[in-house]
Amino acid sequence: MAQALEDGNPLPKASNRPAESEAPSDPQIKDNHCLGRYKVQAVRDSANLSQERIFHSALTVSGASWARRRGELRELLGLQGAAPAGWLSEEHLEPAVPGSRRSSGQGSSRVCLEPREHAWILAAAECRFEVLLEMLEAEPSLLMREDPITGYSVLHWLAKHGRHEELILLHDFARRRGLPFDVSAPGSGGLTPLHLAALQGHDMVIKVLVGALGADPSRRDHSGNRPCHYLRPDASLNLRELSGAEEWEIERDRKRENANNNSSRTTTTTTTTSRWLKRTPSASCIKSTGVHYKEASQPVKEKKASSTQEGQGRCLRRYLFPFTQNR
């Protein structure tokens, strides 16, 4: 009986472990419907967070090209099958291989230069003609390669530095190789080699460009000026005509030159006359000089007359009183 009571009402047993402080537990969601919505929201948040991390990592990849980042964006947007209109294909998205025909072609919008192109631009700016010829023998397509900053080709630099002989040699090289040779190609600001030659005052370069190489003197730069507008003021009329001056401009310059010559002659004549007048004595000066001469000559005449009279008196005394000669 006692055993049955003990089994029916068991007494709590003392525990040897210390009482643990109960930590606040998460709120228990008893509603099954709320629990389902909570799980769905948690899954969505984790998916959005992972996509956001992937998106930011795709945008901040160091050293990745724009084509690769665009491909990753396409994958995130689920556009692997078809590219939107205006996007390049996967072949065009690949970076150009150094030394390939596509990477070294003319008219490229790249800013990064190959070592050979960089060396060519430096040699052209310094007018090292022997180095330029060696590089042209190895790669003739560098002849009309322009500096991406100034827009100058080797023709611009040679014209700027007054190298007319080198211009003729380059023209002969291009003609032998059948290469394009545009002596009127515009550079930065629309300046042609003829503009630069006029700016620097290289008369022989102007004559070679127009007379021998067939440069167009009527080309205008971005300011609307022809090469003749950059000539020095004392340039000859023949040089102005070679540089693209029109007939009315040549006539105006001729009249201006004649007027300057006439004014210079008049000034020279006036200066000579004034100097001659300064050297020639005036009438008043002559009269005053004559009066002073008379005044100065009177004492001399009086001295001469007195000395003559004194001599005559001595002779008369000697004649009348000869005994006084020895005294």
From Swiss-Prot:
Residues 1-31, 251-311 are annotated as: Disordered. Keywords: ANK repeat, Repeat. SUPFAM superfamilies: Ankyrin repeat. Pfam families: Ank_2. PROSITE patterns: ANK_REP_REGION, ANK_REPEAT. Residues 292-305 have a biased composition (Basic and acidic residues). Coiled coil: none annotated. Residues 260-275 have a biased composition (Low complexity). ANK repeats lie at residues 112-141, 147-162, 186-216. InterPro entries: Ankyrin_rpt (IPR002110), Ankyrin_rpt-contain_sf (IPR036770). PANTHER family: ANKYRIN REPEAT DOMAIN-CONTAINING PROTEIN SOWAHD, SOSONDOWAH, ISOFORM G. Belongs to the SOWAH family. This is Ankyrin repeat domain-containing protein SOWAHD. It comes from Mus musculus (Mouse). The lineage of its organism: Eukaryota, Metazoa, Chordata, Craniata, Vertebrata.
